[in-house]
Amino acid sequence: MGLPVFIKMGLFMAAVFISNIVQALTGFAGVMLSIPPTILLYGPDMAKAVINVICWLVCAYLMVKNREYINKKELGRIILFMLIGMAAGIYLYNIVDARILVPVYGLLIVGVALKNLLLKPSVASLPVWVAIPVLLGAGIIHGMFASGGALLVVYLASAFRDKNSFRANVASVWTVLNLVLMFTDYEKGLYNTEFFELLGIGVIPLVIAVYLGNKIHSMINQQMFNRLTYGLLLAAGSMILV
């Protein structure tokens, strides 16, 4: 995008600020909200590299700060199935027509979000025969398109009914899995001077955003948190379909 440098920096800082208020509040959606404008400003490779590290910083902070809410057994199971799915997704990327898979994925996310926004959400956790395919599917989508978070949230919203537990565990999942993407970006040589400049200017709005997100998290009740979660899922699914 042919804008003056200071305007591009300002827009980038605004994207980091707004998206990470939501990231700190819910434990997810920061990447979904910040990647599109950052791609327009700096291109897809640099955008994904710097936003992934910024997201990792927030998630690592939330994981440590809220470690008493982490279900280690559940977290281990999630990461195991996600990693298996990611490996399959990386393989399938070259043999499956993404034009068929992406709309189906988007419709699934929109359907789940609308069901829980318009109807009374189920209080039961997903049965094992549904939970495992959902986690594997989230890993496959993430391995293929680096956007499996929405399907993962479908599982986590069912498994963790408390807003503190949900946020702590979803942040913990991304703290671990984003290390894989960070290593890949490092191997591509994306951690260059431009990367560290963007990371540096992103820290100031990031710190303020995390502070505000935590404040809002403590102020809202569980029902409002649930509606926000499914509202973000609806937005994610809609963006996939566009």
Where are these regions (language model features)?
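Alpha-helical multi-pass membrane helix bundles of inner-membrane/thylakoid proteins
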Residues: 116-138
